[in-house]
């Protein structure tokens, strides 16, 4: 996930990028609902909330099924049944999770859930969150965060080489050099095919 190498979380990275550039595409997400509107599959927000959410309803569950059911109850606003799990210590009994009264505050990062870690949203790992982001209509095959980082990297690679190429082509007329250079000439220079004319 990159934590051991010091890679920031998705929202912390977006905060840093936005502070450096002011670029709207990397503006940090303000709530779980905001994040849900910018991922490929909006219902995936249930899995993100189950994994990273800090609502008491989620943290009170001991099993993955329980955490996911709690996230479903928060997102959908419908009671969810959790199956029994006798293998847990202590065993988990079958139970029903009802939607909490503050679920909309949690999803919108308002009320008691405003600020701070935004209900766990600021803990979403860069790699997982970045892969889940929707592909921009005119932005390549990556989500907005990874697309910005990729473009930034490519531009800096090109900038590093730009003076080399400028000095090598100074005084050349590109059209005059391209016109007599036929494809067969290129093949003859780079292979042992001989005369192709």
Which residues make up each language-model segment?
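Terminal regions of secretory-pathway proteins
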Residues: 1-197
């Amino acid at each position: 996930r990159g934590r051991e190498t010091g890679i920031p979380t998705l929202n912390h990275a977006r905060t840093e990028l936005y502070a450096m550039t002011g670029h709207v595409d990397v503006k940090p997400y303000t709530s779980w609902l905001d994040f849900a509107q910018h991922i490929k599959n909006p219902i995936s927000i249930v899995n993100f909330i189950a994994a990273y959410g800090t609502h008491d309803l989620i943290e009170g569950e001991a099993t993955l099924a329980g955490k996911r059911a709690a996230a479903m109850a928060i997102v959908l606003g419908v009671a969810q049944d959790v199956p029994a799990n006798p293998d847990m210590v202590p065993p988990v009994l079958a139970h029903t999770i009802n939607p909490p009264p503050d679920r909309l505050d949690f999803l919108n990062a308002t009320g008691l859930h405003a600020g701070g870690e935004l209900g766990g949203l600021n803990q979403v790992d860069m790699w997982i969150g970045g892969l889940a982001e929707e592909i921009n209509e005119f932005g390549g095959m990556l989500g907005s965060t990874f697309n910005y980082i990729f473009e930034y990297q490519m531009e800096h690679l090109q900038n590093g080489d730009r003076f080399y190429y400028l000095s090598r082509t100074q005084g050349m007329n590109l059209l005059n050099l391209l016109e007599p250079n036929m494809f067969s000439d290129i093949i003859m220079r780079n292979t042992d095919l001989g005369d192709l004319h």
